[in-house]
Amino acid sequence: MTITTPDPSRLTATQALALIRSNELAVETYARSLLSRIESRDETVKAWAYLNPEFILAQARKLDAVPVEERGPLHGLPVGVKDVIYTKDMPTEHNSPLYKDSHVPVDAAPVAILRAAGALIFGKTTTTEFASTTNGPRTYNPHDPTRTPGGSSSGSGAAVADYQIPMALGTQTGGSTIRPGSFNGIYAMKPTWGAVSREGLKVYSLVLDTLGVFARGVEDLELILGVLGVKDDEVSDGEWGAFQGVQGAKFGLVKTSVWPQAGPGTIAAMDKAAAILRSHGAIVEEIELPPEFDSMPAWHATIMAVDARTSFLSEYRRDKTKISKHLTGYVENNEGYTSAQHLAALDGIASLRPQIDGIAGRFAALLTPSVPDEAPVGIQGTGSAAFCSMWTALHTPVVNLPGFQGDNGLPIGVSLVAPRFRDQHLLAVAKEVGKLFEEEGGWKSSL
């Protein structure tokens, strides 16, 4: 059979997978639908750093020819890959002239895992330079092309939101997955640090870098993260306990020390999110983190700066005129960071990780802002990661949930956070809470 749906590009990954498995949708048909969408929208959004339609269709035909009994759990599902993640059959350029047309003949570990599961590696999505600056690539927010899609995983967030791809990989060192998720009105997850291999990803900070995933539904996040090996320990009812639904569940509302940076859109979104949860029988308790957490932004900034000095020294030595002044400043240590400051930041954050696990473990999840407000106007910058960086440094899993909007009608998300290595629990909570926020939050995509 062949699918009669006019536009398969509108399908979520799990919807498409069901149709491919039932032989109602050919992989080639699906790929052609996505390519048609990209062709019609690329001039507006510009989400792709590399795309080869002929190669995509050839790979799709090969996947269609695979016998049913030999097909993997992601058979035929297209995935976009941020252009700081190695792909053996596509260039990896890092949005840097130093790496123009650079080919590495291996897949990054996450790409290899997805490919082995039958995924169709579709192309490379745009990124800021080395996923390390706030200067945006020439990628535009699909909901309002006068605004940034966020970064540094700019193309992944924009492409998923614009129905150009059902799922995409990103990375996060500060807020590079959660921020584009919020600005583009889609689901995005930064799993627990270390839960997914980072082999084959451009290194910025070994203690912060984390693979991220974008999708248009929590079921899709569960699907891809399950294949990537993200799982929780078995727990007893008396320990964490399984999530039994929103009714009666406890949520901790955490504004954090950077709350003064919240704009009217995020303030309203947090208020509405709490109200929706309470209206469905949840208990929402606003909590203040211990004062030592106030040091998190400065500690995160210290680690970013010092680790960048190490990570980008090779590019600096090759030709410092071909990297941004932002990065040369890190390598030259313009801020004057010392090893003592670096150690204090590393040790300080490490001491807080067990604390946040204990705090978050008292609740179904913590509810916290994703971003200060709607996506800013212009593509010269990608917006602030102020509300994301703490959770990145603490290594906790975080999910952005869409559903809210700002003063200009653009999407704003909120985040749910759980203790480390409670990723599947967090996804179970996000699935139920996300439905409520989508239904009652007030924002719907018009794309």
Which residues make up each language-model segment?
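A short helix-breaking turn/cap at a secondary-structure junction
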Residues: 190-268, 272-273, 436-447
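An N-terminal boundary/leader segment
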Residues: 1-57, 279-281, 341, 442-447
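Short glycine/serine-rich loop segments
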Residues: 106-225, 394-413
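Short helix-loop capping/hinge segments that flank enzyme active sites or metal/cofactor-binding pockets
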Residues: 4, 74-94, 245-250, 302-357, ...
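Acyltransferase
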Residues: 27-32, 61-64, 264-288, 313-318, ...
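Acidic/His- and Gly-rich active-site-bordering loop/insert found
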Residues: 56-58, 66-136
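Glycine/threonine-rich flexible loop motifs
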Residues: 92-101, 263-264, 375-382
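Glycine-rich, small-residue loops and helix-cap segments
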Residues: 23, 76, 82, 116, ...
